[in-house]
């Protein structure tokens, strides 16, 4: 009898290895196994580049991201993301071990409560069964940057409280995310009303989100003040979007990443690729290729900089992320250099570490700093450290002083 009871307990436990769904407890988010989850993710513009979504998710996974925030559409402004499309997106995220934050972008900047309480809720209601099946990986970000106006804290709190009650009433079980007002950058309303919004959810499973650009992130003091204010409320919050430059001004992105690392706060950078006009500088990689092989300077910092994904990302449910996700390259071709001096290549569709010891002694003409030696002696620039550089085959190379 005792042996049978033991087997029954074992079966019950094994069937619930991943069962609780993503859950907020206090100011932290936990996966279904009870592991703390700190977002280190990337925004993916599915609504405008649907044919690139699967590839983009594979790329950010190969670079170590643990999450993706996906731009969807209800059909009110852009082509509707259908049930079958959403099913594919979720499966791609899960196959890559990425926590999937889903947001509808149609109501960005809108001040109309009906857009949230009716239109956004109706869209999520249509998708409810699919969303509930995947509550271990899916978070519902009700709407991107609803309420563009400032100083309307009561409207923000009332509207989101009503929307959350409506979503729970139709049976949605997923964790919910709510953006700040003022295009995601206003601090007062979210600080003053976050607890009221949280209390509207019978599950108390709400994550709050700042978006950081040239207002909230205009300087270190503004950013730290806004972050400290929300931190003091004790709610669970993340940075759902941020860039390095916006509206003609720099953003305190390095301070942001350091603050988040020091305080256990998650972030999701904007955005993988496809930005237009003045926002093209926010592309993390080439808009032509969408490839992790072609990271911009912004992309290199997000992945390899201080507090970046390479150093800090940990996958949910014990999956590999950050350094654990990489092996050494077979070859010695360098495509990026981390802030810590690490050299990186790109092979077989994913990033890999350059084995400097192997490459320096392999006869491949690799300089001690990990870059290849030039075949010629034509100098294009001299670094502050005295190293002379050339340019061959559309890449930087080191002048070989022993030959030149």
Indicate where each model-derived feature is located.
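Redox-cofactor binding/interface segments in oxidoreductases and associated redox assembly factors
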Residues: 44, 70, 209
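Aromatic-lined substrate-binding rim segments of carbohydrate-active enzymes
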Residues: 52-109, 117-122, 161, 168-170, ...
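Cleavable N-terminal signal peptides of Sec/SRP-targeted secreted and luminal proteins
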Residues: 2-19
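N-terminal carbohydrate-binding accessory modules
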Residues: 15-67
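Extracellular/cell-surface secretome signature
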Residues: 317-404
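Extracellular glycoside hydrolase catalytic/binding regions
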Residues: 50, 119-139, 143-275, 279-307
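Structural motif
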Residues: 37-39, 65-67, 97-99, 135-137, ...
């Amino acid at each position: 009898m005792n042996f049978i009871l033991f087997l029954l307990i074992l079966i019950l436990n094994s069937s619930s290895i991943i069962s609780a769904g993503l859950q907020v407890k206090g100011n932290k988010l936990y996966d279904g196994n009870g592991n703390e989850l700190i977002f280190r993710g990337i925004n993916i513009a599915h609504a405008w580049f649907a044919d690139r979504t699967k590839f983009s998710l594979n790329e950010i996974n190969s670079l170590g991201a643990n999450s993706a925030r996906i731009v969807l559409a209800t059909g009110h402004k852009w082509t509707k993301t259908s049930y079958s499309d959403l099913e594919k997106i979720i499966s791609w995220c899960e196959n890559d071990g990425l926590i999937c934050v889903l947001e509808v972008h149609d109501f960005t900047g809108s001040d109309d409560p009906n857009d949230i309480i009716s239109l956004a809720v109706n869209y999520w209601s249509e998708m409810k069964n699919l969303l509930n099946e995947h509550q271990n990986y899916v978070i519902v970000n009700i709407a991107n940057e609803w309420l563009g106006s400032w100083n309307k804290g009561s409207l923000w709190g009332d509207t989101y409280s009503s929307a959350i009650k409506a979503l729970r009433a139709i049976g949605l079980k997923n964790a919910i995310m709510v953006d700040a007002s003022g295009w995601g950058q206003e601090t007062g309303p979210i600080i003053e009303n976050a607890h009221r919004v949280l209390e509207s959810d019978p599950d108390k499973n709400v994550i709050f989100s700042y978006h950081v650009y040239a207002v909230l992130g205009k300087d270190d003091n503004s950013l730290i003040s806004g972050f400290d204010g929300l931190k003091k409320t004790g709610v669970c919050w993340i940075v759902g979007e941020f860039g390095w430059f916006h509206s003609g001004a720099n953003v305190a992105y390095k301070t942001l990443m350091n603050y988040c690392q020091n305080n256990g706060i998650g972030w999701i950078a904007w955005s993988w690729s496809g930005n237009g006009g003045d926002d093209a500088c926010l592309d993390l990689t080439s808009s032509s290729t969408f490839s992790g092989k072609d990271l911009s300077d912004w992309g290199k910092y997000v992945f390899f900089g201080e507090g970046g994904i390479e150093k800090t990302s940990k996958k949910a449910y014990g999956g590999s992320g950050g350094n654990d996700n990489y092996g050494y390259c077979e070859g010695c071709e360098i495509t990026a250099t981390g802030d810590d001096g690490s050299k990186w290549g790109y092979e077989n569709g994913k990033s890999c570490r350059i084995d400097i010891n192997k490459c320096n002694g392999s006869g491949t003409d690799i300089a001690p700093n990990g870059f290849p030696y030039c075949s010629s002696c034509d100098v294009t620039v001299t670094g502050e450290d005295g190293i002379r550089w050339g340019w061959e085959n559309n890449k930087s190379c080191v002048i070989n002083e022993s030959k030149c």
